[in-house]
Design a protein with these regions (language model features):
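Short, well-ordered beta-strand elements
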Residues: 28-33, 198-211, 231-237, 306
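A bilobed periplasmic-binding-protein/Venus flytrap-type ligand-binding module shared by bacterial periplasmic
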Residues: 127-146, 285-299
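A conserved helix-loop-strand patch within extracytoplasmic ligand-binding domains
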Residues: 27-51, 153-158, 278-306
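Ligand-binding "clamshell"
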Residues: 27, 92, 106-120, 266-278, ...
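Short helix-initiation/N-cap motifs at beta->coil->alpha
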Residues: 60-88, 235-246
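Short, polar/charged alpha-helical segment
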Residues: 46-54, 59, 65-67, 208-237, ...
């Protein structure tokens, strides 16, 4: 082959390599789904930061927004969508951050399926602890106090751990070393417990996520009945996370059991609600799940570093 021909071949190879490199650089970023509601959006961003996909402005603290992402370490794009659609759309994303409220009904178990689990302290102040909320004027209501006391018992703690398989954790003191009375063999007896509201004081509690995510309130009802408290818990289900606070503010329900401390502060500030925490309930850690990849490293490899 003459020198001119060799030069042509070399130029062609160089051009092909350049085109390949350009194509790689121009490849569409892998999509990472996060909840689009305020508090969980922040949690999702923080979890993706912990996974090493992005860097976030430290000044944003626990509540970063998309604009606070300062660097994408890999060729990824963070995409907020409705939290309740994240499980059903998991296949459309490289990975998504999903909390237990929506993961449980979809059959996702953190210890089995999650690529990364949000780390949360089970004691002390935590902005993502779920709480029971009352109108501030009712914070000393004795009936409501009894409901919280019944929830924060060993039976309910055991039920949370056994029934939800590490998706929910108690956010109140309990004896971790005790021989649990609640087991896989009898947990269904508690979730299937039936009570009557005849002759009892009815307390309406707002929840989201369907019955399967709120069976701990059935365990709480059993505790109340065993104590002869004459209190009946009526769960009022809402389709959207922002509705229970409005309902309790309007007097349509008595308590709200579906929100974190961080969201409560934000929602009260935005809407002028006079609500307060009367008890901690559970911790539902956010997790990274994927149908396409079996590890965080596999996602990073597919995305490519930037």
């Amino acid at each position: 082959m003459n020198r001119i021909a060799k030069n042509i071949v070399t130029l062609a190879a160089t051009a092909a390599l350049a085109l390949t490199s350009a194509a790689a650089l121009a490849a569409a970023p892998l999509q990472l789904g996060v909840p689009d509601d305020g508090t969980n959006l922040s949690r999702g961003i923080k979890l993706l930061e912990a996974a090493g996909f992005i860097e976030v402005d430290p000044a944003a603290g626990y509540t970063p927004e998309i604009k606070d992402i300062t660097k994408h370490l890999y060729n990824v794009e963070v995409t907020p969508i409705a939290a309740n659609t994240l499980p059903s759309t998991l296949g459309d994303f490289a990975a998504s951050t999903i909390n237990g409220t929506y993961a449980v009904p979809y059959g996702l178990i953190p210890s089995r399926d999650a690529l990364l689990i949000e780390k949360q302290d089970e004691n002390g102040e935590n902005p993502y602890v779920n709480v029971v909320v009352a109108r501030t004027a009712d914070k000393d209501n004795e009936v409501y106090k009894k409901v919280v006391e019944a929830y924060q018992t060993q039976l309910v703690a055991e039920f949370l751990l056994v029934n939800y398989h590490e998706t929910f954790f108690p956010a109140f003191p309990y004896d971790e070393g005790a021989t649990f009375a609640v087991t896989e063999d009898n947990v269904s007896e508690i979730s299937g417990y039936k009570s009557s509201k005849e002759g009892k004081t009815v307390v309406k509690i707002g929840v989201c996520g369907g019955v399967s995510n709120n069976e701990q309130w059935i365990a709480t009802q059993k505790v109340l009945d065993d104590e002869g408290a004459n209190i009946y818990i009526e769960l009022v289900e809402f389709d959207a996370y922002n509705l229970p606070n409005e309902a309790i503010n309007n007097g349509d329900i008595d308590l709200n059991a579906f929100q974190h401390k961080a969201y409560l502060a934000k929602d009260c500030g935005a809407n002028g609600y006079d609500l307060t925490v009367i008890g901690d309930t559970l911790i539902a850690p956010l997790c990274i799940y994927s149908e396409k990849y079996d590890s965080i490293d596999a996602i990073k490899e597919a995305a490519g570093a930037k």
